């Protein structure tokens, strides 16, 4: 359009004259050195301004071009996709920068590297809009992107490049990281809890996992011997498992049954059968076979206990004795399986009728005699003494402890004449009576040996075994010496026979010679 005068200043007048130009109203200032300032710059101020110097003789002009710049806002990624899918071209988002003048350019970056358009993989759509009022530009760049698994945790950014008074500048956006969806490529199955050994009665949970993102929420579970899968979430629980649950367990994707995983489960078991068991009552001398049978998924250890004391071997009774009575426990366990133990008990009661043996001995002082009634039987027999004849009783019925069905009662007596002592032993099975004649204290008599107690029996047996061993060694030595001596004597006799034979031949020769001489004469 036509030039418009906007300001005038005379060298002779100090005042400034501004023309009536509405768009510059109250925005112009012309200084004494003829510098024109425009406040509150606008895009419309981008024009050609001319400074004119008018003199009496001539007119001088000095034109200049005014450029207006507006820095755009920091770019921002908006309309972001909630996730990206592999092998699918999908809109990632829009990068927008507002209020720019002049307009700028937008660039996308993946992990700091510029994204260049690539058909079917990277699609960029750029557009700009100018506000009709402010004449400022808004730039928008849309990015469509086909993601791969390599884009997991990758940083996407964008920048705007614009021109300012000092040249080209760039402003970066904040980074954006997108969740990458990808299909399951492998299925795995787990057994929970993750202990190594499973026993009967346990609760186990099968957990199926797919390595896709997001992971599958439903699977098909296949139990041993069942061709049809059971549809469930990613877990399937088995309660109170039994030994017949041992086998291969599988799971697969619902929509892709060929993608399957399997695991082998062994349910360990342990059975124990004790025969007989519970409380068993037998008679002394009876035979009692005892068996503890084990059935287990692995080799099991077996321990026998009697009255809380571990036995070296399994009990076997060909002829029951009172000391065989007690509480027997057969216990077994699988060492590799925690908590898998079984035990059965046998309470053995050995009963017997009372048996009595009586002995007597004279006190070294010669003033009293001790009579002992040895009793064995079970239940414990009660002992009762009776005396026939006269005599003074010094100390009556002192009893020993009842051990292994045996005990004894002693009575000390100083009879002035011959007496008979009777010992009666009685339990629920029978009443047994035995008597012993005891001479008067003044009459010496042969003492009978005491019954060997159970505590001393083992020591005596050990000593007897030792003595027998020594005697056998002595006999062996004597036998060897005898054999050597016999061989020596035999050899000596043989030599003697040879000498005698030779001597006899000499004598016979002499006689023959004498006879020959006589014949010749």
Swiss-Prot record:
One of its GO terms (biological process) is heterophilic cell-cell adhesion via plasma membrane cell adhesion molecules. Homodimer. Interacts (via extracellular domain) with CD6 (via extracellular domain). Homodimerization and interaction with CD6 involve the same region and cannot occur simultaneously. The affinity for CD6 is much higher than the affinity for self-association. Interacts (via glycosylated extracellular domain) with LGALS1 and LGALS3. Interaction with LGALS1 or LGALS3 inhibits interaction with CD6. Residues 183-266, 271-347, 354-439 form the Ig-like C2-type domain. The chain crosses the membrane at residues 466-487. Coiled coil: none annotated. SUPFAM superfamilies: Immunoglobulin (SSF48726). Disulfide bonds join 95-158, 208-251, 292-330, 373-423. Pfam families: C2-set_2, Ig_3. One of its GO terms (cellular component) is plasma membrane. Gene3D superfamilies: Immunoglobulins. Glycosylated. Residues 63-172 form the Ig-like V-type domain. The lineage of its organism: Eukaryota, Metazoa, Chordata, Craniata, Vertebrata. It comes from the Eukaryota. PANTHER family: CD166 ANTIGEN, CELL SURFACE GLYCOPROTEIN MUC18-RELATED. It is found in: Cell membrane; Cell projection, Axon; Cell projection, Dendrite. This is CD166 antigen. Residues 488-521 are cytoplasmic. Residues 500-521 are annotated as: Disordered. The keyword Transmembrane applies. InterPro entries: CD80_C2-set (IPR013162), Ig-like_dom (IPR007110), Ig-like_dom_sf (IPR036179), Ig-like_fold (IPR013783), Ig_sub (IPR003599), Surface_Rcpt/Adhesion_Mol (IPR051116). The CD6 binding site is located in the N-terminal Ig-like domain. It is a single-pass type I membrane protein. Cell adhesion molecule that mediates both heterotypic cell-cell contacts via its interaction with CD6, as well as homotypic cell-cell contacts. Promotes T-cell activation and proliferation via its interactions with CD6. Contributes to the formation and maturation of the immunological synapse via its interactions with CD6. Mediates homotypic interactions with cells that express ALCAM. Mediates attachment of dendritic cells onto endothelial cells via homotypic interaction. Inhibits endothelial cell migration and promotes endothelial tube formation via homotypic interactions. Signal peptide: none annotated. Residues 1-465 are extracellular. Glycans are attached at residues 33, 105, 244, 299, 395, 418, 437.
